[in-house]
């Protein structure tokens, strides 16, 4: 990481504000079905991570995050997926500084809406292709992107988890693609609806 300073000056040239920010440089490519990071093949050894503490439940603190980073590094884990929602903001700074790659997941999970007694039955799948859900879905994607777009550790955007597939999730994919920020986009439930497997996410080929 590199330390950058943005200076804001008044009309008379006097210094009004200084904003420090740690930045990094990265280039992600897929060449012959292999992911490269800054020109070198990327081998991912990653885990899903929930924000959880055995005593405080879903309310975790900075020390919990530091312990998780330490655990990842001790076990040679180089990447983490923020399942199944965006994490607290400090977590992304910690991943930046520790060199942990991040799949930043959008806050979307609705697996109960397309399963009936364990079977796949998507007649009431939400958000699916219902037009009344599109705005809310895109808003969640936008919130994820705009909040965390400047974090070098983020290599992937995730559209969510276990929410079947449909026009609305496809629209999320288009939203991230139009940003052209060089990151890859992933979604793990496209296989439930093969009509969208080529327009949402590629799960099965070996990149």
For each feature predicted by the language model, list its residue ranges.
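Secreted/periplasmic carbohydrate-active enzymes, especially glycoside hydrolases
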Residues: 1-94, 98-102, 140, 155-156, ...
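Substrate-binding/catalytic cleft of secreted carbohydrate-active enzymes
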Residues: 70, 79-207
């Amino acid at each position: 990481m590199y330390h950058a300073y943005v200076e804001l000056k008044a009309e008379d040239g006097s210094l009004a504000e200084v904003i420090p920010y740690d930045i990094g440089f990265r280039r992600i490519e897929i060449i012959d079905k292999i992911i490269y990071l800054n020109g070198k093949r990327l081998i991912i050894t990653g885990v899903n991570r929930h924000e959880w503490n055995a005593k405080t439940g879903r309310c975790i603190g900075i020390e919990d995050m530091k312990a998780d980073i330490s655990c990842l590094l001790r076990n040679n884990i180089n990447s983490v997926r923020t399942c199944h929602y965006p994490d607290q903001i400090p977590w992304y700074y910690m991943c930046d500084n520790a060199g942990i790659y991040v799949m930043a997941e959008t806050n979307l999970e609705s697996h109960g809406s397309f399963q009936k007694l364990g079977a796949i039955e998507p007649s009431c799948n939400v958000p699916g292709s219902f037009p009344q859900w599109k705005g809310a879905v895109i808003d969640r994607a936008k919130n994820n992107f705009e909040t965390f777009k400047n974090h070098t550790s983020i290599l992937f955007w995730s559209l969510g988890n276990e929410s079947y597939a449909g026009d609305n999730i496809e629209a999320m994919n288009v939203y991230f693609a139009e940003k052209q920020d060089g990151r890859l986009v992933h979604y793990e439930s496209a296989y439930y609806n093969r009509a969208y497997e080529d327009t949402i996410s590629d799960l099965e080929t070996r990149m």
